[in-house]
Amino acid sequence: MKTMIRNTLAAAALALTLASPTLAQDLKEVRISSQPALLGSVPFTLAEEKGWWKEVGLKVTITNFPAGAPQIAASKSWDVGYTGSVPAVLGAARFALHTVAFSDDQSATNALYVRGPNADAIIKNPASLKGGTVFLTGNSTVDLAARSCLAKFGLQKGDVTVRSMGQAEIIAAMSSGNADVGGLWAPNTYTVEEKAGAKYLCSGKDTGTTVPGNLVVRADWAKENPQLVAKFLAVYLRAQRHLAANRKGALAVMKRHYDVGGVVISEAAMNKEFDTRPTFDLAGQLALFNRGAQPSKADGTMNTIAAFMKEVGSLRADEALPDPKGYVTDEYLKLVDRDPVLKAFANRSN
């Protein structure tokens, strides 16, 4: 009964707050950076369509970048953003960016795919890749996943030739028969399945290598505007819960979002996006980022990413590995959790 009363009061408080006639007159600007046609940026489109930013008192502008590197390099021009885990580490090391939540678990969708007459034989005996060539995008999350897969197959550095190229080039090479083994991330994984007849070989999930998407903030801006960060997170989490609970509507907004980004994938592929990339509600985020006396799960994940970046040279030899305690924080998730209005907002699925 007490829980029911608390929930009712929180809902009432939320309704009163969001119905405030002064809210629309006092919107606070938040500049969001993102990347187009990715699952982690779909919540931005949904929130805009639903008017949720304004409901919590935010006026947002969204700037899309073609990749993580230019996005992070331009970090002074935005306040919060969605990016990959590799640029999130680079942003922590060089631009004082803090990771405040994970967008989703992309471990199953950073993967190696095979095609051609030897595809089934390679799937049956992955060690037969020895002496072959793997095409992937170097210094990226799929590079990390591919390295973990090759190690699982018992292959050492130098057992295969790795050629680095962009994702579009890999898709073209596999579709034309000029490449048989490629490392890709979603939604490109679905494209090579459908256009090149490629088959799944291995992903980060198979090796226990977690590959998250990251929600990041400029540390100086966040320190001055903690409540704006909390409101941003509350909207994002609500959008994710809505997408998870309303598949038909989720597919429709995903299609609109991907169309704007110039990516066309089938409905089956869009369903795979949701089915293979777990997201986290507020309680799940808090569990991932809970440090206590031991490093958090998020700490361990980001340490793995940072060590990989050091290995491949994305972090310079003179750069120390960034300590997660200095840039991975649950401070703003806790603000959401402690605020009855924001917590109720974040936990809604409609």
Language model feature labels by segment:
Residues M1-M4:
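N-terminal secretory signal peptides that target proteins for export/translocation
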Residues R6-L18:
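Hydrophobic helical h-region of N-terminal Sec-dependent signal peptides
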Residues N118, E169-E267:
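Pocket-lining segment of extracytoplasmic ligand-binding domains
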Residues T301-N350:
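Conserved C-terminal helix/tail region of periplasmic/extracytoplasmic solute-binding proteins
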